[in-house]
Swiss-Prot record:
Gene3D superfamilies: 2-enoyl-CoA Hydratase, Chain A, domain 1 (3.90.226.10). Keywords: Cytoplasm, Hydrolase, Protease, Serine protease. One of its GO terms (molecular function) is serine-type endopeptidase activity. InterPro entries: ClpP, ClpP/crotonase-like_dom_sf, ClpP/TepA, ClpP_His_AS, ClpP_Ser_AS. It is an enzyme of class 3 (hydrolase). GO terms for biological process: protein quality control for misfolded or incompletely synthesized proteins. It is found in: Cytoplasm. This is ATP-dependent Clp protease proteolytic subunit. The active site is at S98, H123. Its EC number is 3.4.21.92. It comes from Pediococcus pentosaceus (strain ATCC 25745 / CCUG 21536 / LMG 10740 / 183-1w). GO terms for cellular component: cytoplasm; endopeptidase Clp complex. It catalyses: Hydrolysis of proteins to small peptides in the presence of ATP and magnesium. alpha-casein is the usual test substrate. In the absence of ATP, only oligopeptides shorter than five residues are hydrolyzed (such as succinyl-Leu-Tyr-|-NHMec, and Leu-Tyr-Leu-|-Tyr-Trp, in which cleavage of the -Tyr-|-Leu- and -Tyr-|-Trp bonds also occurs).
């Protein structure tokens, strides 16, 4: 059971109650938390498009705490981040693993951050296949194609050679916030709001 806090704001016209996520959206803050699936992706994409249509000159702040999830859903968010005109600042809090690490590194260059005790984890995509031999071969080819696509994005975002990304994503590879900065996945560590290390 997920309880969503309510925030009450006073104005000259009286009180107004918002769920916390709607209130954060007024400040151009989007929360990407939990496993990435189609429903979460649709919610994030809708918020990105709404904020960009509202004012494409202002930054959007995407806070990420996610174990990753469905690659196609994550790539839909990735494509939208690149499609809109607004700069997207990414801020990792807690963990950005798997597909979430790709999104964290895909924020606007110079505006990709992590909180001091957060972690980033990169690895190869996982999947399973069953059925006839040809179906298993098709699934294996698809996962190899997906791995190449994700590693290419990580290489572009980090500035690391694709060969290094291929090696470093063979297994789960956990990076502290500082390690993620040195690797090139993020640009800085946020000690305080708008105060970068």
């Amino acid at each position: 059971m997920n309880l969503v806090p309510t925030v009450i704001e006073q104005s000259s016209r009286g009180e107004r109650a918002y769920d916390i996520y709607s209130r954060l959206l007024k400040d151009r803050i989007i929360m990407l938390s939990g496993p990435i699936d189609d429903d979460l992706a649709n919610s994030i994409i809708s918020q990105l498009l709404f904020l960009d249509a509202q004012d494409s000159e202002k930054d959007i702040y995407l806070y990420i705490n996610s174990p990753g999830g469905v690659v196609t859903a994550g790539l839909a968010i990735y494509d939208t981040m690149n499609f809109i005109k607004s700069d997207v600042q990414t801020i990792v809090m807690g963990m950005a693993a798997s597909m979430a690490s790709v999104l964290a590194s895909s924020g606007t260059k110079g505006k990709r951050f992590a909180l001091p005790h957060s972690e980033v984890m990169i690895h190869q995509p996982s999947g399973g296949a069953q059925g006839q031999q040809t179906e298993i071969e098709i699934a294996a080819e698809q996962i190899l194609k997906t791995r190449k696509e994700l590693n290419t994005i990580l290489a572009e975002n980090s500035g690391q050679p694709l060969e290094k990304i291929n090696i470093d994503t063979e297994r789960d590879n956990y990076l502290s916030a500082q390690d993620a900065v040195e690797y090139g996945l993020i640009d800085g560590i946020m000690e305080k709001n708008a105060n970068l290390k």
